[in-house]
Amino acid sequence: MSDLPRHSPRRQHAGESAVTAITSPEDTTKAVVIYSGGMDSYTVLHRALRAGFEVHALSFHYGQRHSRELETAHDVCQRLGIAHQVVDIRAIHGLIGNSALTDATQTMPDGDYDADNMAATVVPNRNMILLSLAIGHAVNIGANVCFYGAHGGDHVLYPDCRPEFVERMNDVAAIADFTPVRIAAPYLHASKEEILADGLAMGLDYAQTWTCYLGAERSCGHCGSCRERLAAFAAQGVTDPLVYAGAGASD
């Protein structure tokens, strides 16, 4: 059993949107978006574009077992004609590499996306590291807002996706440089299903995303990340446009 603390997504009140406001009167026209190539950050990317920001997307190679998400992110940004950098920080792999996402000798957990099953996929301090680099880039290019794709379904498993983490990082980002930077996580209180619903309402094509923890030609359909994605599509009554190899997934 995992000894991770139990957190649940915040309960939504009647009439309350799961998508939080992403603009502030103090925002500049430029924004940095941490973009992995997955469906959460893909939806955040388009939310920022719809809000009128000049988006500068950052993707990070931190020693992941495969680069399918990064390739997907590159293709999407090229298609959209937006600034995009893939930042190679694999030098830190020896410091934070004890995760099934970064260590090919570890078994990737199958099954449901929950704390007990998915604890092996935690990369220590990942979002703090990536946000710190994104904040520095924002200051460098004259942006004062950084977006990332934390969502309510990750609160149980990933401490750096929880509301209290975002709140504290905002406090630090406001004083870490002469230029305050705001961290925005528009889906912080949303489920994967709600993120998908928002993206579908924007007309997004989720064939342009990669979710699977494995880097095969087709998504496996049985890792925790695939199962969460498939459940979101099923809940929306929509067929996932990706072609899956795993048993129980759509062909």
UniProtKB/Swiss-Prot annotation:
Zn(2+) binds at C212, C220, C223, C226. GO terms for molecular function: ATP binding; ligase activity, forming carbon-nitrogen bonds; zinc ion binding. Coiled coil: none annotated. This is 7-cyano-7-deazaguanine synthase. InterPro entries: QueC, Rossmann-like_a/b/a_fold. HAMAP family: QueC. Binds 1 zinc ion per subunit.
